[in-house]
A protein has these predicted regions:
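Conserved catalytic-core segment of nucleotide-activated headgroup transferases in glycan assembly
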Residues: 171-254, 264
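Catalytic binding pocket for nucleotide-activated donors in carbohydrate/polymer assembly enzymes
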Residues: 7-11, 21-24, 38-46, 50-57, ...
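Short hydrophobic/aromatic-enriched beta-strand-loop microsegments
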Residues: 161-168
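Nucleotide-activated donor-dependent transferases that construct or modify glycoconjugates
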Residues: 1-15
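Short amphipathic alpha-helical segment that frequently serves as the phosphate-/nucleotide-binding helix
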Residues: 16-23, 202-206
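Residues at the starts of beta-strands that form the adenosine-phosphate
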Residues: 2, 35, 109, 162, ...
Length: 375
């Protein structure tokens, strides 16, 4: 089956936290025989910050971020059996969704893949005239990056036919333990781009914790933090490319995860960095959110903090031996329950079941039409 996938970027994680997620799922679907083309705009300087070159398991079409070129790639949706429009492309999102769904063949499966479902739901509720309201019923399904039961209920209440979370996971071929790298040596490392709806929580869980532990080393990676006030024990290293994530996660005594406001409110939304860090056998400290235990067991496979004071207390008491043990357990858990091979199997089964249902419906309708013709 051919898939036309319209998203932010497959080849660059620069200001694009969904890159690892896209790569893991699409790579596994390709292994299962899907023929996939990923369409991404040349926007936000991502192409000059590529983490990977176009892979052999997916065709990548990069188009200029103009309405004319967007319309050209939209027309190619007609070639696919499954058409996927992801959220957060960042350029002509509404026009892109309308265009690819209109261009899709009548027998094609139409999917909206929401990689920021809490924000999308909030926007739809705030704007009753949002164009997506009219389009939801025309979609065959909504797949989401996370969100669990609250997001499923929200989407179905807004008119979606089907909604299913496909959670982040680990690609063990990409993320795994490596030898420590001294440039990433620290007691607590945090890797994330600076975003408005996460900044307050970063201040609390990371910067506040650093102020409470002036004798400990804190390491901050990610784009946008240059002018953020930091205590003297916080070292900022800028954007960290995907190829260095394993060393970052394998070197720090502990690695912090901080959810965005919307994700923390909804819950059931582990970020890619959680599985990247677990894959490198890192000891993860996360802010508290509903559903953590569905992915890693608190206290044994991950440490959970309610605020910066909790983070500081956990780091102050954490020994290298305990950190290593928590990391080993986290790695074993994600290898057992949370790999992209398992997520790919979920998506594959969903696609096949849906298409079988559609074919059965077409046969029934054809049979009824034939019977009416005889009468």
């Amino acid at each position: 089956m051919k898939i036309a996938f319209y998203g932010s970027s497959l080849v660059s994680s620069y200001w694009n936290g969904a890159a690892t997620y896209y790569r893991g799922i699409i790579r596994d679907l390709a292994r299962r025989g899907y023929d996939i083309t990923f369409y991404e705009p040349d926007a936000y300087d991502r192409q000059s910050h590529r983490d990977i070159e176009p892979p052999d398991w997916c065709r990548v079409v990069v188009y200029p971020a103009t309405i004319e070129h967007m319309k050209r790639v939209v027309a190619r949706a007609a070639e696919a059996d499954i058409v996927v429009k992801a959220s957060g492309v960042g350029v002509f999102d509404n026009e892109l969704l309308d265009g690819v769904m209109a261009a899709a063949r009548p027998d094609a499966m139409r999917i909206f893949w929401d990689v920021d479902a809490p924000a999308t739901i909030a926007e739809l509720r705030e704007h009753p005239d949002h164009p997506m309201h009219a389009g939801l019923a025309d979609l065959d399904a909504v797949l989401t990056y996370g969100g669990g039961p609250p997001i499923v209920a929200a989407y179905e209440s807004l008119g979606a036919r089907h909604c299913r979370p496909i959670y982040n996971a680990l690609d063990p071929d990409t993320h795994h333990p490596v030898a420590p790298d001294e440039k990433f040596r620290c007691d607590l490392g945090f890797l994330a781009n600076r975003l408005p709806d996460r900044e307050r929580r970063v201040e609390e869980f990371f910067l506040n914790a650093a102020e409470q532990l002036p004798d400990r080393a804190f390491l901050l990676g990610g784009a946008g933090w240059e002018d953020k006030p930091k205590s003297s024990n916080v070292r900022y290293i800028g954007h960290v490319p995907t190829r260095d994530h394993n060393a970052f996660n394998s070197t720090a005594l502990a690695v912090l995860n901080v959810a965005r406001d919307s994700m923390a409110t909804i819950g059931y939304s582990p970020a890619t960095r959680v599985f990247e860090a677990a894959g490198a056998a890192a000891c993860i400290v996360t802010d508290a959110w509903e559903g953590v235990g569905l992915f890693l067991e608190p206290g044994k496979e991950i440490l959970v903090a309610r605020d910066g004071r909790d983070v500081a207390a956990l780091i102050a008491e954490l020994t290298p031996h305990r950190a290593a043990e928590i990391g080993r357990r986290a790695l074993a858990r994600v290898l057992r329950d949370h790999t992209y091979a398992q997520r790919g199997a979920e998506v594959d089964a969903f696609f096949r079941k849906f298409r079988e249902r559609g074919q059965m419906r077409e046969r029934r309708e054809a049979g009824r039409a034939g019977a009416e013709g005889v009468l």
